[in-house]
């Protein structure tokens, strides 16, 4: 399971002209689900995403996680993160989970975030989405479990 996380000052996702999720300061989480992923991996990734210390403390040091910084989370499904790009000029998606399994694990991940009393907004699984963000830093990390 892969999370591309970006520290943002604001982010939103729009589907068919409707804003489905919007946050102020916090994390934009682009989430990719691979074939061998399961609930245990989703739990570990959620723990890492919410616990990752990439927000500045009073001394300007990256020492706070999103909860400590008072931020929110916007989770957007992105199957392209599971692409195999090692050969050729076209990505292969053979590493990605089936759509049904990916959606179930995406929903599970979102619910785990919410269970941690985290303000969690979402896109719409498998939809054509427009994601807007202001990357703060820029600060972007690839987390994989």
UniProtKB/Swiss-Prot annotation:
It holds the Pfam family Tyr_Deacylase. GO terms for biological process: D-amino acid catabolic process. Keywords: Cytoplasm, Hydrolase, RNA-binding, tRNA-binding. It catalyses: glycyl-tRNA(Ala) + H2O = tRNA(Ala) + glycine + H(+); a D-aminoacyl-tRNA + H2O = a tRNA + a D-alpha-amino acid + H(+). The lineage of its organism: Bacteria, Pseudomonadati, Pseudomonadota, Gammaproteobacteria, Enterobacterales. Its main location: cytoplasm. It comes from Escherichia coli O7:K1 (strain IAI39 / ExPEC). It comes from the Bacteria. This is D-aminoacyl-tRNA deacylase.
């Amino acid at each position: 399971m892969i999370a591309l996380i970006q520290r943002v000052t604001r982010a939103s996702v729009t589907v068919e002209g409707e804003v489905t999720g919007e946050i102020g300061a916090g994390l934009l989480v682009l989430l990719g689900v691979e074939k061998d992923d399961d609930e245990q991996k989703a739990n570990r990734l959620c723990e890492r995403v919410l616990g990752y210390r990439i927000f500045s403390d009073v001394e300007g040091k990256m020492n706070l996680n999103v909860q400590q910084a008072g931020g929110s989370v916007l989770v957007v499904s992105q199957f392209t993160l599971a692409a195999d790009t090692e050969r050729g000029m076209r990505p292969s998606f053979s590493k990605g989970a089936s759509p049904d399994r990916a959606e179930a694990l995406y929903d599970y991940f979102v619910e785990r975030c919410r269970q941690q009393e985290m303000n969690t907004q979402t896109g719409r699984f498998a939809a054509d989405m427009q994601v807007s963000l202001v990357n703060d830093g820029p600060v972007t990390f690839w987390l994989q479990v």
